[in-house]
Amino acid sequence: MGHKYDVYGMGNALVDMEFEVTPEQLASLGIDKGVMTLVEEARENELIAQLAQQRGKQSSGGSAANTLVSLAQLGGTGFYACKVGKDEAGAFYLQDLNDCGLDTNPHHETAGEGITGKCLVFVTPDADRTMNAFLGISGSLSVTEMDWSALKQSQYLYLEGYLVTSPSAKAACIEAKAIAEQSGVKTCLSLSDPNMAKFFQDGLKEMLGSGVDLLFANEAEALEMAGTSDLNQAIAYCKSIAKNFALTRGGAGSLIFDGENLLTIGTPKVQPIDTVGAGDMYAGGFLYGLTHGMDYEKAGQLASETAAKVVTCYGPRLDTEILQEILQSVQAV
């Protein structure tokens, strides 16, 4: 049967605010470098005030949203299940999804029920990405926001690992995965962040259940989940929980397991300035490839090229024209 959507994604809806800082500033502000940390609203407002002079651009973020936006820019179709508040940031966020060609669940939240989440993104000169997120109303994402008919009309269900921090969102992920499996929709999960694998491992294992069709992880996340410092053991662990996986390794490229063979995908040599969104972009390129007739190797090449490009500029997204050029160059080989 024909599918209405290539991917049905579930994730946090956060407006990103980017700041260029030094590692010393992060230390003086008491911010853990290189990971995502959840903070309360008061703490977030305090940081915004202290760093007002270094504030960069504001954009719609959320890991799975970034993935679906890149999928749509490449020419794919997506539905994004999320939750925003009835405020300026929420309106900005929904308009952005709409402008990108993505469908989303209706938002009928009344004023006063909660505010749209924000993520402070700190970029250091070494191109590392550090995040402090206040989830706001996104933290109460639940089965209420799900559109099961849209899910059943999709090729893939994409779950964002960050949702593990919210009991209601985690429960929605588990239910969505069960419905996907009953409906012949392939399931995939992104581990999202080393801190998720470290502090919410039991919850991630609940979300994984009996396993997924496709797992996205970076090396640090895979090692943390496997409880090892040995890459081969981490690979064996990934094989035990996913039929296929893509394991990203930064400048060393990525490893893709297609169900039979472990493929090594190189990555273009670039000078990274901001690694925010690299994993999201990789997943978007990979899922576009798989849903548009590419084999795992070709999809991996597209994913690597798009991720390598996004780290050379600030922010988690690329212009559509740039992504289309990359797609054409990969298809031409």
Curated annotation (Swiss-Prot):
The keyword Transferase applies. InterPro entries: Carb_kinase_PfkB-like, Carboh/pur_kinase_PfkB_CS, PfkB_dom, Ribokinase-like. It comes from the Bacteria. Keywords: Kinase, Transferase. GO terms for molecular function: kinase activity. Pfam families: PfkB (PF00294). Its EC number is 2.7.1.-. PANTHER family: CARBOHYDRATE KINASE PFKB DOMAIN-CONTAINING PROTEIN, SUGAR KINASE. Belongs to the carbohydrate kinase PfkB family. This is Uncharacterized sugar kinase slr0537. It comes from Synechocystis sp. (strain ATCC 27184 / PCC 6803 / Kazusa). The lineage of its organism: Bacteria, Bacillati, Cyanobacteriota, Cyanophyceae, Synechococcales.
